[in-house]
Amino acid sequence: MGLKKRVSFDWLLKIGIILVLAFLGLFGIIFGSYKLLNDSRLGVVFNGSTTTTVYFLNHKSKDANKELDPTQKKDGNGSGNNTEMITDVNGFLNNIEKSYANSLYAQGFSSVNITKNSHDTSAKELSDKGVFDSSWLVNDGLPSISVTFEQRREEARTRARKRQIDAQVKRNALSAIEHNYKLSLETTDGIVLFDSFDKEFIRNSLTAVVPQTTNTNSALTFEYKLSKNVITKESLHNDFLDFIKSKSLTDSDYNTGNGQKSVEGSGKWFKDKANGSAQNGNKTLVLWKDKEGAVQYVRNIFNVPKGGTDYLTFNEREKNLWDFLHAEGNFSSGDNLFLQKNNNGNSPITKASDITLKNIYYIYAAPTHFSQVATKDNNNKDAADVVAVANSADTRKLRSGDATGFSGLFSNYILAEIRTEDPVAKNGDPVKVNATLQSFLDSNNQRLEHGGNIKFQVANFVNNDGSYVPASYLEASRVKVLLSNGFPETATIAAANTKLVNAPLSNTLARDVSNFASSFIALGVIILLATIALGIRYKLLGLYKALALALSAISSLAFFSAVGGVVDVFSFVGIFFVVAVNIINLITLAELFLRNIKNNASIVESWKLCLKRSFFTMIETHICWLLSALVVIYLSNYQVQQLGTLMAVSAITSYFLNYGLGVILVWLFVSSHSGLEWRFFLYKKDAQALTKTSSNYSILTENNDIQTDFFISKNQHDFFGKKKWSLLFIWLTVLAFGVVMLGLYLGAPQLLGNFLAADIESSTGIMLGVGVISLLYLLYSLPRYGVAYGISYLIALILLAAGLFGAMYLANFIFRIDQSTIQLIIFVYLFWLFFQARIGQTTIWTYCYWFKRSLKDRVFVKNLFNDNVNSQWRLDLIGSSVLILLFIVYAAFNFGGINGTINLVIFYLIAIVALFSVFVNGLPLFSFGLINGWLSPYNYVQIHITLRHKKQMFKEVDQIEEQLISGINSF
């Protein structure tokens, strides 16, 4: 065994490359981990769920310019009726479902699940409480959407604090749900110039501008089609001003009064002339992104009783808003910016319905009045009050604009404010366009690409302190997603109600360690345990593989985060499956290497055969993985789409890093002189085969000789015995069950339970991703591996369907946990990926190793397949247990409830993974190789096989002789 040690350039080069790759791998692991732990786009990891039921009016307005108000009595059925029924309620709810699925992701929420009810009678309870007028009820019910999601939640150490946190979580959920994103350009008193439902608005023109290399700023652009056919660069602004004039704004605050005339005077919000005595209006337009949401948010703040649990959850800004609305605290004085009290000394706002779409802007700010001319003369007696408006912030004076001012809350609802005109030198002079309108309608940026004839640009967004800041690409993209996924035009929220679903999870390490950090630590522990196990079992080979495994896992998460993915519970569940698949692939290659060694192959030859027998199968597996992920990305929404993105990234990193880097490292070392030293790879008992010589063998003619002499290592189980044929009946029964379950899912999925993801499209995306790629692989396998293999795969796939849907049904029946935290349809996709990877592993271990050569030489198939099953059961056992062990480690770091209680969600997760593992790793995979043998075209029931008694020279390592060596198929 001894080898002469010598240093050569080849040795130095290969060892040097190994060290460089290992260093780069370690650097990638450390740097990737650092980036992840400091990433701002971290989602929530099992941190508590809320369910919010939103009730919608099943009426719509006949006039597109008039909104329905659920707090007011519905119009009667006479000629003055302005409402009509929504006929397709289910289609209406489907559109809202899709809107929530995408917009909540853009807001940063995790684990969203959505259910619909076309006639929810629980709406009557809210109507009886006066939340909305009962005249809107239809048969004592309304259509509703129930949305469950997770959000960040801090720890509560006292019972009182827990109540406050519960209230805060519920209120945050309500605020998030009651958004109705719609782009709307309006006057300050609510007259709509156009909105995103206008037929002339080019909806698909919403674009987040990619920053130039010399500038990091972005912008939001969109196109509109004015009635004028030709708009030139020179006439651009005047044409838009003509468009404004066509809207009949004579009595609007835009043209008349002091800028807020509509809310001033006796019995109104502000005292007369609180905004000055100018008479030319304010010439200000407001670009809203969610005006209805702003109204609902302010109404909710107003309705909270002072000193109650909800009030205690207010931040300083919200407390200031509450004080302003009730004319209390610092807002009780007679300041012109504050509300004027009525005769009883109370706020003029007496009920939430007083806050409307027409007056909501004036809670936010007092518009700067407009002066016709810029100098004081006989034509402009108020010219001394002229205020220069150089930017959007100058268009108004915030009601509360300090560091804790409530006006900053409106940054969630207002995009921009635009002053259209500047004062002229004297009456009669041409209109002078304000700088904010010039920015909004940039004459140098009128490249029209979507069918409009005018292009608007918002380069600065309202910040959370009320100031204006340049738009970042991330924020512009987020706003674009929100506006592109608004409610249908006919949607009006009547009411909403929120409840907590389950106690949130905390970590088990320390109070100051976040849920994400503890989950990431769990991932690190998993990789460490895998490294130790691989290193002990496979020595240097295992350490190389462990490095590739760690780099692949961290790179998958890091790249996923870099492309905009939110690292949350779905990401960790997905990455654990990726790690499990990669571990199985590594173990398969390592065991195949040892198998070749035991078969009298040299170390170099053994590794060559490993590559030869695994290369194309690995490509096939990862291509299926990647293509299915792309289908899911294209057809799904929200976190299911994100999971598809993670799987697509992982397919690439797993092949090139987990498989590719591991192969390169081992090959470089094996091909060096040091690699010829067996002690780096093998224990003494495994290395004994390196000194054995091939024995003389022959294939005898008698069946008894074949059974007694050829297969010296007796099979522990005979799966083809007469008594075992009863198993065929069981398999056929399960096969029929799989067909039935598939039929039920396609025809009546509600009978199987609530297995859908956040929305129907996502569930459809998963099923198409699984079904289409499985069919393509089946068609591919027929010419590559033969009909027997293809039929075996098809049967195993149907058995898998029985297992997956059966596991979903049992999990739903046994645990009945909230689907928001664990969506079972997600596990259908993940376990299909796991199944597909195991098919590849089985193909490497059996078909590529045994079938081709053995069947070619007409080996007795009965004994061959018995030996296959007996040789693979340990790999099957490892494959079945790896996932369960991974989630047990995950649970060890994430089982403690914030309030000192144990949350069972994480243990349900372990049980569900175990349940799915049994169904996926049991019958489908077990039967795959066995059925392949049954369907073999060779007659294995004949009594005698006639072959020549001669020694055959094979071009590669003999795959039959290994059965002469005791213990070759064990490890």
From Swiss-Prot:
Query: What topology does it adopt in the membrane?
Result: Multi-pass membrane protein
Q: Carries keyword DNA-binding?
A: no
> What top-level branch of life does the organism fall under?
Bacteria
List the GO cellular component terms: plasma membrane
Record localization: Cell membrane
What are the entry keywords? Answer: Cell membrane, Membrane, Transmembrane, Transmembrane helix
- Bilayer-crossing regions: 11-31, 516-536, 547-567, 569-589, 615-635, 651-671, 727-747, 763-783, 795-815, 817-837, 878-898, 900-920, 923-943
Quote the protein name from its UniProt record: Uncharacterized protein MG277 homolog
The organism is: Mycoplasma pneumoniae (strain ATCC 29342 / M129 / Subtype 1)
